[in-house]
Design a protein with these regions (language model features):
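Helix-loop boundary and gating motifs at the non-cytosolic
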Residues: 2-63, 213-258
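Helix-to-loop junctions at the C-terminal end of transmembrane segments
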Residues: 64-78, 167, 267-280, 364
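A late C-terminal transmembrane helix in Major Facilitator Superfamily
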Residues: 336-367, 376
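Intracellular juxtamembrane helix-capping segments at the cytosolic ends
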Residues: 37, 121-135, 240, 320-333
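C-terminal ends and interior cores of transmembrane alpha-helices
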Residues: 87-103, 290-302
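Cytoplasmic helix-loop-helix junction between adjacent transmembrane helices
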Residues: 112-154
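C-terminal transmembrane helical hairpin of 12-TM major facilitator-type secondary transporters
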Residues: 281-325
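Loop-to-transmembrane helix entry/capping segments in MFS-fold secondary transporters
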Residues: 48-49, 138-148, 250-251, 335-345
């Protein structure tokens, strides 16, 4: 089931190992803030709707800045933006925490959340573009993207657990402050790891199209698919803190995230070693249908153990789906727009998560957790069927005679 040969070949590169390890800490705030901001605002305002709105503002800002930063990086390289954005993001998180704890008006909190998201450092997009531009063969690239997906899942495992620990010890505010520290120190370490050099040279073209990668029909459809799937993920994930809160043990939310993320990371790594014949859009379709079924199982759960089991079974599809989405976009995007293409992916994914969190928060307060998960299942089913509209590409080259 799991062939480690390509992973051994991948990490025989000592510099790449250092870069990958250095990329973890500055990305932990993604996993921490998605939950930490929700719990921090909810603890101060008593409203999941307000909490979902603030999280949506933060994620929306991540979405807005991503293509702009991506185009800057494609045209000038990542050196000039990485460290300044890391420091500004840490400062913005400090100001956001102050605004929430001092019970500032909702408008001020929303502006603060947007400001924090608008200056997030481009760690993930730099890593993915580095893989896309490298001279690695298709098998190594699939494993590299699988590692990338597993790291992101790891951030969503460790991040919520750190938030849960701070809730046991003190307040969700401490989780956001810890995220600020990780953003500043982690970005500095990542910038010194060799990643900015390894990213390569800027690929100059005679005339860059103003739409960048969006001029490609296949890229546009792949990105819209990512948007739909991320909306479903947002609807699903907002139910985790809501279920924990309804059970009377809010700190359990970290265990729900872990129950979902650990199987996701394991399956993501396993998927990276597989050489499947199916086109990537059909692999993504299968993952979407699995997530739809898992959401229905979670909706039917009333006991904590059953909900955790539903989270675990649902999570099995997340890792493979995220890896396949990255591979699909990497195959469809023109090489000179590789960083910008991945930033558009980040943009629409964050918009979808934000919309899902916002809509889910409203639905939970008005209709309950189960209804929200049923809506998630319906959306995932529609998104899965839309996979067939994306041009077919394969993750790895098939051997002759296959």
């Amino acid at each position: 089931m799991l062939d480690l040969t390509t992973y051994r070949a991948l990490f025989a590169d000592h510099e790449l190992r250092r870069i990958v390890l250095a990329s973890v800490a500055p990305r932990l705030p993604i996993g921490m803030n998605a939950l930490g901001l929700t719990l921090l605002v909810q603890s101060q305002s008593g409203s999941f709707a307000h909490a979902g709105l603030v999280s949506a503002a933060y994620m929306g800002a991540l979405a807005v800045q991503a293509p702009v930063i991506g185009r800057v990086v494609d045209q000038n390289g990542p050196r000039g933006v990485m460290l300044p954005l890391g420091m500004l993001h840490a400062l913005a998180l400090l100001l956001l925490t102050l605004a929430v704890t001092q019970r500032a008006p909702l408008a001020v909190v929303l502006v603060s959340a947007f400001a924090a998201g608008i200056v997030f450092p481009p760690i993930s997009m730099t890593i993915r573009a580095m893989y896309r531009k490298s001279d690695m063969n298709d098998a190594l690239k699939q494993s590299a993207f699988a590692v990338e997906a597993a790291i992101m899942e790891g951030c969503f495992i460790i991040g919520p657990l750190l938030v849960s620990l701070t809730m046991l010890a003190a307040s969700p505010a401490f989780a956001v402050l810890a995220a600020a520290l990780l953003a500043s120190v982690g970005t500095w370490h990542f910038a010194r790891s060799g990643a900015l050099v390894r990213w390569g040279r800027v690929e100059y073209v005679a005339q860059r199209h103003w739409l960048g990668p969006l001029q490609s029909f296949g890229v546009r459809r792949a990105l819209l698919l990512s948007l739909c799937l991320s909306m479903g993920i947002g609807l699903n994930e907002i139910t985790l803190p809501a279920f924990a809160n309804a059970s009377g043990y809010p700190a359990r939310v970290g265990w729900f995230y872990a129950a979902m993320s650990v199987p996701s990371a394991i399956m993501g790594v396993a998927y990276g070693s597989w050489r499947l014949r199916w086109p990537l859009n059909r692999q993504i379709m299968l993952s979407g249908l699995w997530l739809a079924g898992g959401s229905l199982l979670m909706a039917a759960s009333t006991q904590t153990w059953a909900f955790m089991l539903g989270c675990a079974l649902t999570g099995l599809a997340f890792g493979p789906m995220m890896t396949a989405l990255s591979l699909q976009l990497g195959k469809l995007a023109p090489s000179e727009y590789s960083t910008e293409a991945f930033t558009w992916s980040t943009t629409l994914f964050m918009i979808g998560l934000g919309v899902g969190f916002w809509a889910g928060g409203m639905m939970i307060e008005r209709h309950g957790i189960a209804t929200t998960l049923v809506a998630c299942s319906a959306l995932m089913t529609i998104a899965a069927l839309c996979c067939l509209l994306v041009p077919e590409v394969r993750g790895t080259a098939q051997p002759e005679g296959a």
